């Protein structure tokens, strides 16, 4: 059996190859959407009508990618609780909790705004609302940090009289224009490598219970979906640099 280092190199190489070839394809055939451009992000992907995975409403994006850490957590815990006693170690739980903290720091909170949000702002990003007309309106960054819905009635100073808005209209602002690190690539890579690492103890024991066998199958399936999702993200979303910085942050 290959040593742990070799297995890790192979896993990272597979993900790198998927990301590289997907990104090259997106550049050669102009299939990617620049998600940091406020003039484009509110529009459907230009290939949405002909490429199924170019639409953000596809089931894998809605039910898996956006909830990937939840799936990862469930798969790992199912595997850990059904593992043979000799491999059900506290060290494995510690690894999970460490990665959970990393995920939260990058995506949710880092002494205020998350690290991803800080990167966008530090690289020139602004908090932007997309009006129904497609025009972007810049608002204070705090609106994006708090993720609150902005409506003209409560924030009249943000909207000029030249904008005609439908009654009851409101929008949640997003950070745009800066370097929008691909959170999907970051999270999917984190999930795939973690689950791969956590499968290794299972393959070192000779016999599994039926429940643990099911857990292993589920973990392998989720790794497969993560790899596929990295591929679709590489082909259809984010600029090449944004995708590779999402990968390199690991």
Positions of PLM-derived features:
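Terminal transmembrane helix and immediately flanking juxtamembrane interfaces
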Residues: 1-250
């Amino acid at each position: 059996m290959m040593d742990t280092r070799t297995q890790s190199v192979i896993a990272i190489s597979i993900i790198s190859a998927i990301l590289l070839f997907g990104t090259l394809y997106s550049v050669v055939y102009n299939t990617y959407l620049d998600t940091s451009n406020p003039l484009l992000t509110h529009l459907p992907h230009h290939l949405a009508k002909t490429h199924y995975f170019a639409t953000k409403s596809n089931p894998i994006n809605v039910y898996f990618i956006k909830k990937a850490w939840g799936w990862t957590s469930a798969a790992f815990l199912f595997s850990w609780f059904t593992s043979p006693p000799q491999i059900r170690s506290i060290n494995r739980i510690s690894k999970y909790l460490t990665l959970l903290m990393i995920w939260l720091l990058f995506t949710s909170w880092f002494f205020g705004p998350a690290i991803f949000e800080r990167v966008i702002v530090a690289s020139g990003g602004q908090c932007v609302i997309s009006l129904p007309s497609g025009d972007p309106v810049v608002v204070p960054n705090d609106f994006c940090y708090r993720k609150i819905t902005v409506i003209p009635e409560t924030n009249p100073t943000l909207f000029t009289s030249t904008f005609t808005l439908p009654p009851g209209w409101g929008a949640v602002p997003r950070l745009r224009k800066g370097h929008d690190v691909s959170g999907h690539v970051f999270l999917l890579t984190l999930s795939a490598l973690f689950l791969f690492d956590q499968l290794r103890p299972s393959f070192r024991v000779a016999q599994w219970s039926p429940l643990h066998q099911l857990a292993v199958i589920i973990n392998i399936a989720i790794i497969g979906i993560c790899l596929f999702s990295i591929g679709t993200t590489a082909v259809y979303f984010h600029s090449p640099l944004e995708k590779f910085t999402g990968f390199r942050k690991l």
